[in-house]
Amino acid sequence: MKKSINEQKTIFIILLSNIFVAFLGIGLIIPVMPSFMKIMHLSGSTMGYLVAAFAISQLITSPFAGRWVDRFGRKKMIILGLLIFSLSELIFGLGTHVSIFYFSRILGGVSAAFIMPAVTAYVADITTLKERSKAMGYVSAAISTGFIIGPGAGGFIAGFGIRMPFFFASAIALIAAVTSVFILKESLSIEERHQLSSHTKESNFIKDLKRSIHPVYFIAFIIVFVMAFGLSAYETVFSLFSDHKFGFTPKDIAAIITISSIVAVVIQVLLFGKLVNKLGEKRMIQLCLITGAILAFVSTVMSGFLTVLLVTCFIFLAFDLLRPALTAHLSNMAGNQQGFVAGMNSTYTSLGNIFGPALGGILFDLNIHYPFLFAGFVMIVGLGLTMVWKEKKNDAAALN
């Protein structure tokens, strides 16, 4: 019988710390992007491609990672992902040419592909269906907290040198990996892993993609793509937009992102479980998409620090509530295919994170408002998809 979350506090703290560390490193780069852009004489499109390189790497690796999570165990994949992440941040901190930055982001994508499905599957393994949405909410809160500390730490530590934040991220990732070696235990027995492996050993990327377009999964995965596409397009150019339009410094940008993230994560932790129980996952997803779309359009006419802060707070909140609602929905339908579903979730996220930043950077070079208009349009498309989304509770088990 599975234990409650309260009975497994140490395990949850380690898991949440690991996912926090991964997204901390991503958050670190946000406030220093304009400075890197100026120092390296890079265009907005190049910055977008740099973000997209991370996602391309994650996309290519995710299907394999999803199967390896089932075959080799969650713990091994988490530790390996953290070690690769540590190396990628160290390389970025030492880099002196844009090609080195690309290589670093590619390694970062591999690490994310390892860590995300492993942590998600681990949480699903040790939680009951009743507590799973709550647990996924904690995972999403850890991600959000990474964005809270990341930009804040990046803006502060950059005062000691623009590369120092990356050395810091590398060090704490290494510490997290070592801690996981000694504290985490495999969530599944060898027999259970063999059973899962028997389902996945003949699997391949094309086959997994074909499985993902089954009506049980497809609309949910497309919404994952839409969410990642719109949010990544917004996030990629936000710091550049703030620098170009308002002349915000790295500390200003860090303050906006940090405060917005704190507000979002506090509300998420306090209200997510209650809202999902009252509205249901589907209505929660729809509410978040329409809120995000409206605020993306509002972003093009906002002015002044306080207005930017207010709009950003609500956009972060919308996506911080959307992410766990989607993850919980997919996890609940996955049955004994947690590794596959988590891996494909990461795959569709990567697809959105490839095209969103790349197109966002190109649109930014044309007009600094275009990325926000486009992000809003994409979220409206996602909202439309949820209107034809029919939830089928038992079909996923039949696919296993």
Curated annotation (Swiss-Prot):
Under the GO molecular function aspect, what terms does this record hold?
xenobiotic transmembrane transporter activity
Q: How does it sit in the membrane?
A: Multi-pass membrane protein
An example GO biological process term is: response to antibiotic
Q: Which InterPro entries match?
A: MFS (IPR011701), MFS_dom (IPR020846), MFS_trans_sf (IPR036259), Multidrug-R (IPR004734), Sugar_transporter_CS (IPR005829), Tet-R_TetA/multi-R_MdtG-like (IPR001958)
Which of UniProt's keywords are assigned here?
Answer: Antibiotic resistance, Cell membrane, Membrane, Transmembrane, Transmembrane helix, Transport
List, alphabetically, the GO terms of the cellular component aspect. Answer: plasma membrane
Q: Which residue spans adopt a coiled-coil conformation according to this UniProt entry?
A: none
Principal subcellular localisation of the protein: membrane
Where is the protein situated, by its record's location annotation? Cell membrane
- CDD domains per the UniProt record, alphabetical: MFS_MdtG_SLC18_like
Which residue windows are transmembrane per the record? 11-31, 46-66, 78-98, 106-126, 142-162, 164-184, 213-233, 253-273, 297-317, 346-366, 368-388
Show the NCBIfam families listed in the entry.
2_A_01_02
The entry assigns this protein to a family as follows: Belongs to the major facilitator superfamily. TCR/Tet family.
Function of the protein: Energy-dependent efflux pump responsible for decreased drug accumulation in multi-drug-resistant cells. Probably uses a transmembrane proton gradient as the energy source. Causes the efflux of a variety of toxic substances, including such structurally diverse compounds as ethidium bromide, rhodamine and acridine dyes, tetraphenylphosphonium, puromycin, chloramphenicol, doxorubicin, and fluoroquinolone antibiotics.
Q: What is this protein called?
A: Multidrug resistance protein 2
Q: In the UniProt record, what gene is named as encoding this protein? A: blt
